Swiss-Prot record:
Gene: nuoI
Source species: Ruegeria pomeroyi (strain ATCC 700808 / DSM 15171 / DSS-3)
Topological relation to the membrane, as annotated: Peripheral membrane protein
Protein name as catalogued: NADH-quinone oxidoreductase subunit I
A single MF term (Gene Ontology): quinone binding
Its job: NDH-1 shuttles electrons from NADH, via FMN and iron-sulfur (Fe-S) centers, to quinones in the respiratory chain. The immediate electron acceptor for the enzyme in this species is believed to be ubiquinone. Couples the redox reaction to proton translocation (for every two electrons transferred, four hydrogen ions are translocated across the cytoplasmic membrane), and thus conserves the redox energy in a proton gradient.
A Pfam family it matches: Fer4_7
Lineage: Bacteria, Pseudomonadati, Pseudomonadota, Alphaproteobacteria, Rhodobacterales
Catalytic activity, EC: 7.1.1.-
HAMAP family per UniProt: NDH1_NuoI
Length: 164
């Protein structure tokens, strides 16, 4: 005669697995959602986030770049091109500052190499384009990015200062 396993039979007839599954489903149904609705909601960004490039200015409006070309030299993708001319006061300023964003690998070496924090990778990550030519940034485009994002860039650099 076969032995009846009463605990197994009780589980089967009382639908224990079904109720455990229902409890788990209801737990997750009423818990807060982990997913955000992206275009309408945005998650937090780290102060170290590396997004769209920008050239910064001093508070008096003068561009920060001193044409030392360290960013051009350190760029592993060779995406940065700089031409410079000396000024009457002996300092140098750029006449051409181009970044080919199709080559850029967003490593942040240009930002680390810059002695005056002129070139930074800003907080903007939504810069999709329709044509390839729009991804070739010239000096004017980089300066306008810097003007647009200056407040957030300055805040992020201040938050990151203890770690630099």
């Amino acid at each position: 005669m076969t032995q009846i396993d009463y605990t197994r039979a009780a589980k089967y007839f009382l639908l224990q697995d079904f109720w455990v599954g229902m409890k788990l489903g209801l737990k997750y149904f009423f818990s807060p959602k982990a997913t955000i609705n992206y275009p309408h909601e945005k998650g937090p960004l780290s102060p170290r986030f590396r997004g769209e490039h920008a050239l910064r200015r001093y508070p008096n409006g003068e561009e920060r770049c001193i044409a030392c070309k360290l960013c051009e030299a350190i760029c592993p993708a060779q995406a940065i091109t700089i031409d410079a001319e000396p000024r009457e006061d002996g300092s140098r300023r750029t006449t051409r500052y181009d970044i080919d964003m199709t080559k850029c690998i967003y490593c942040g070496f240009c930002q680390e190499a810059c002695p005056v924090d002129a070139i930074v990778e800003g907080p903007n990550f939504e810069f999709a384009t329709e044509t390839r030519e729009e991804l070739f940034y010239d000096k004017e485009k980089l300066l306008s990015n810097g003007d647009r994002w200056e407040a957030e860039i300055a805040r992020n650099l201040e938050l990151d200062a203890p770690y630099r």
